[in-house]
C-alpha cells in the first residue's frame, strides 16, 4: 500500500495494525509486486487502475504484472476498466474478481468454517473470491498457492462474470440491510419498534438476527455502499432490463446514513453510536427529521 495514497489516517492506522508494509509511491508498489489486488471504494476503481498503469509506464520492464480488480462494480464498469488497461499496451494481465463474505479472521482451534480446507490456511475464515477472465495465474511460480490461500475460484473465462456475481450477491445482503434500516427507523418513529422485533422474532427469527447484525455494522461502510447500490442498479438494468429505481432507492438510504451527523462519523474499530439496531433506528430517525425540518 503506497504511503502517499490519499487514504484516511484511519485506513493507514488499520494497515499498520495488520502489519501491511507502506510504500512511498505507486511506482515502488509496482516495482515490488507481481500481483496487485485492487480493493477500494467502487467510485475509485477506475482511477486506481489508471494509477497502476501510469506507474508501470514509468518503469523500464517487460515483467508481467497481474492486476486483480476486486471492486464492487457492474460488469460494464469492470469491462471498461479492463479495456483501458489493455489500451495501455503494458505487460499487465487483468483479472476480474469479487469478494463474497466477511473479512478474513482467525478461527478457534479445530473450528469448521465454510472456507476450511486441507491446506495450512484452514485455521482461518476466508471469504470466497470468485475470479473470471482469460488470464489465470499459471505463469507465476506461486500461482497455485496464491489461488488456494486467497480461496479463489475461477468461474468464467469472461471479464465481468465475477463482478456480476458480486452484484447479484450484494443485492440480497446489502439490499436487505437497506430495507431493514428503513423498516426499523419507521417503526421507531411509530413507537412500535419493540413490537416489530417481537413479531419478526416469532415468525422470522433468522431475519431478525440478520438485521440485528447487519444494520449496526453498516454505518461506517455506508459511504462506500452508495456507489455499490448504483452499480447494482446499473447491472440489473443492463443485464436483465430491470428498472433502476429499487437499488437507486437503496443508494439513497446509504447516502442518508453517510450524511447523518451522528452515524456518518462512525469508523470501523472506533464505534460510538449505532452499535445496536435500536440506536441506528433512533439516530437515523433524528437525522431524517432534521433533514425534513424547514430551515
Q: What do the PLM-derived regions correspond to, one by one?
A:
Residues 18, 79, 83, 243-246, ...:
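Metal- and O2-centered redox machinery and metal/ROS homeostasis
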Residues 162-273:
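Helical "substrate-binding/catalytic lid" subdomain
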Residues 8-11, 45, 49, 78, ...:
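A general structural signal for well-ordered alpha-helical segments in protein cores
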Residues 257-295:
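NAD(P)-dependent dehydrogenase/reductase Rossmann-like domain
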Amino acid at each position: 500500500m503506497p504511503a502517499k495514497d490519499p487514504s484516511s489516517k484511519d485506513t493507514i492506522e488499520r494497515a499498520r495494525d495488520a502489519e501491511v508494509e507502506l510504500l512511498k509511491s505507486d511506482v515502488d508498489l509496482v516495482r515490488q509486486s507481481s500481483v496487485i489486488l485492487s480493493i477500494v471504494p467502487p467510485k475509485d476503481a477506475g482511477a486506481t487502475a489508471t494509477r497502476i498503469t501510469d506507474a508501470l509506464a514509468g518503469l523500464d520492464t517487460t515483467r508481467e504484472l497481474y492486476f486483480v480488480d476486486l471492486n464492487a462494480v457492474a460488469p460494464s464498469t469492470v469491462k471498461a476498466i479492463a479495456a483501458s488497461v489493455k489500451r495501455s499496451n503494458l505487460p499487465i494481465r487483468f483479472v476480474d474478481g469479487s469478494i463474497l463474505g466477511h473479512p478474513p479472521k482467525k478461527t478457534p482451534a479445530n473450528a469448521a468454517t465454510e472456507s476450511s480446507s486441507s491446506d495450512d490456511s484452514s485455521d482461518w475464515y476466508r471469504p470466497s473470491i470468485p475470479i473470471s477472465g482469460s488470464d489465470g495465474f499459471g505463469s507465476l511460480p506461486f500461482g497455485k498457492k496464491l489461488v488456494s490461500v486467497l480461496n479463489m475460484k475461477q468461474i468464467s473465462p469472461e471479464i465481468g462474470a465475477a463482478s456480476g456475481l458480486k452484484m447479484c450477491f450484494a443485492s440480497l445482503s446489502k439490499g436487505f440491510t437497506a430495507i431493514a434500516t428503513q423498516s426499523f427507523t419507521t417503526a421507531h418513529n411509530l413507537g412500535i419498534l419493540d413490537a416489530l422485533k417481537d413479531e419478526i422474532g416469532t415468525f422470522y427469527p433468522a431475519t431478525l438476527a440478520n438485521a440485528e447484525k447487519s444494520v449496526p455494522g453498516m454505518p461506517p461502510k455506508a459511504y462506500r455502499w452508495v456507489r455499490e447500490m448504483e452499480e447494482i442498479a446499473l447491472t440489473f438494468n443492463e443485464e436483465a432490463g430491470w428498472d433502476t429505481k429499487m437499488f437507486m432507492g437503496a443508494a439513497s438510504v446509504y447516502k442518508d446514513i453517510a450524511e447523518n451527523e451522528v452515524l456518518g462519523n462512525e469508523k470501523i474499530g472506533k464505534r460510538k453510536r449505532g452499535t445496536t439496531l435500536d440506536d441506528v433506528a433512533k439516530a437515523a430517525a433524528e437525522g431524517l427529521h432534521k433533514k425534513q425540518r424547514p430551515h
